[in-house]
Amino acid sequence: FARINPETNVPQKIMGDLLGYLLLNRDFHISEDTPDGEKVCRSLLAYYNTGEGAEEIQNLLSEYRKVIYENDAPMEIYYVDILCAIIMMALSKSSWSLLPRYSELDQSLWSDYLKSPKAPRMLWPAQQLIGEKGVLRGQSAIVQLPTGVGKTKSIELIIRSSFASDRATTAIIVAPLRALCNEIANDMISAFGDEVLVNQFSDVLEEDFSLDLFLSLKSKILICTPEKLSYIIHHQADFLDQIGLYIFDEGHMFDDGSRGAIYELLISEIRGRISWEEQLILLSAVLSNAEQIQKWLLGEAGVLASDPKIKATPKTIGFASQTKDIHYYSDDSAQEDFYVPRSIEVIALQRRTREKKQRYFPELTDAKDIAIYYANKLCKNGGAAIFANRTSTVLSVINRIIELRDRGHDLAEIKGNSDGEEMNRLAQLMSDYYGEQHPYTIACYLGVVPHYSNLPNGLRLAVEYACRNKALRLVVCTSTLAQGVNIPIKYLFMTSFMVARNSMQIRSFQNLMGRTARAGMYTEGSVIVTDPRLFDNRNNRINGGNLRWNDCTKMFDSSASEPCGSSILSLVQDIVIDYQAGFIGSEVAKFIIENYGKNDCFNQLISELSSALLERYPSKTNNNIAESVSFRKRTMEAIENHLCFVFSNDENTDRQAIASEICKETLAYFMANDDEKALLERIFDIIALKISEFDHFQLKNYARTMIGIDLSLQIEKWIAENHLTQQNYTNEQLVKMLISFFLETHTLKKEIGCFADICQMWLDGCSFVEMHECTSLPIADLEDICSKSISYELSFFVGNIIDIIEINDEDIVNPLPNLLLLQRRLKYGVK
């Protein structure tokens, strides 16, 4: 605001205080400089405390405006008109006014909440939109809005209106990541306090839940991942009967690899069981075909809440150049907005002992160097993140930062703007995992931390906590950050748009970009592309520079985002190897249909596709055939398991007919053309035919495992052969047997002879550095093995065995307590 002179410009002072009160949650000071101004202030404060007196405010405001006009002071007249406009707008958007109207509930039901400091004094455009669409009245909806427009508060208001109207006593929020579930749980606890029971389920696929939680008289908010919810209903099908409100956050997971199939079948199951009284909300910031999803999921019973006019916090998009400039663009990639000249100063680095070549920083062709340079310069203004396209790149960026320190480069801005105490604590925690000499530990002392999927959960939570509390200013991260984790980032430096070997999806990048300049954290932000080749070669047709530029600029256009597809539909779609080669999806699907009953169906498919590819393109030995076929196998197993669940809870003997109905209820079938629909029906039919060999009791057991029938049968056989319920095994014997069986039935990404030793060290609580000293394997490989192969796959496999074991009266031994404990130890890596 302009400088305020309270003696000559009272309206300006009132306006400043009011905006601080409404937007920044500051105290509202009563202006006693003029009697009429004081009356306006007191009536405003009374209104926001009680919800009463809106008409009186308008009358007092009219009188106050008249008095100011009579004083004939030009600046006071100017500001009193602005003040009147602000107050009238604030009253029209007031929570006291809108929430009772949108929810069709009496104001008294909102009164206690709106009097509390946690309540919003005005509703944001996103919250007004969901109100106007009837979501607060119980209307099911797809909510497609950009990140950072008030989604968390919207979820809270949806839940409050549902509880206040008695439409629901239990709400469940489903989010794709444990980190996101943690964040949502903390937000809900902060918002509701002791009013409701907030229960976050663990992500361990074990029976750590009970229907007894519904006995509590308090309203309940449950939070879990899609896999956990699917696991729960496969064990207790009537669990869903207790839920009145379903909220799916980041609800664009239908085509997320093999997880997508589980997600689609889960939502299809809920969709089929939900009554008109229950409410289903699916939220996503990047659902470009939201209308299509809404027609499938909700039909006439739901609405689409989306408005392109609602924008996220503004962000500037910059491109680095070898000329040391940054060029900024907005909506039109052909029209530059402005540029910042000579923003880089290249500095000579100290030579190491016996080093002759002079080295400089930053190297103007190195995207990572440019990102580090700008991060060091800008982090004093707010949090910065350097995006790395893979975990190995995270390490290389951190190694470069350490090298720069060793060569005498000044990184004081990064370290100086961090909380030294908190960084020391983080460094100590990092040392416990990786050792004192690991680059991650050293980087913590410099104010830099990593963030990626394989980082141990405790460390990742500590890093996110430090970021949220602004204890550090620079994080080097992968695309894991795009999946909904909210930390305060003002500057995002993109070193690459590739993820592994593929270009990042536009919607993934949009989600990543949405982490910057989030409302309530920063009012603006910047995304800077630090690979200078993109800008410098934008007009160059040689080597595809212009094509890469076009692909890059599309990333910033939310309207160009890929439509959300279906993993199940991928079963009948083409396998694309590269721009030259691929396989017709219908032919691949027909092969699977014809050979599905054979044990080696998918191995044979890999062999035939590989032979056909190499016969035509002998050089394409490094291809994605095995990965594509493996994805199809996992998707088929997900369908298989879901049909086991449905058949085990349905007395109808015509399983083919049931399978056909389930197929027709999927998003895949809704999106498919006629030929694809016919193939999908055949796929569901052959799976139903395979399942028809088993009785209800067997199917119930197989459904509980969340895996395919073939592996369930192998587990049954292994349990019987090893007399698990007849012979008492020590824990050591049990671990060895399980690891051996796991290796027989699973394929590791890398053949590792010391896998059993790593498992034992993991169970003993050894750190990565201790494992590295014993095995000589790179720490990055050990991270991958422990977080994926052991913590997820092996612990899940032990859970499968637990689900299949049946304890009878004649059994001598009950191995379940030991197996349950072992499952948790494998999950968390503790003794």
Give the positions of each predicted feature.
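N-terminal helicase ATP-binding lobe
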Residues: 1-831
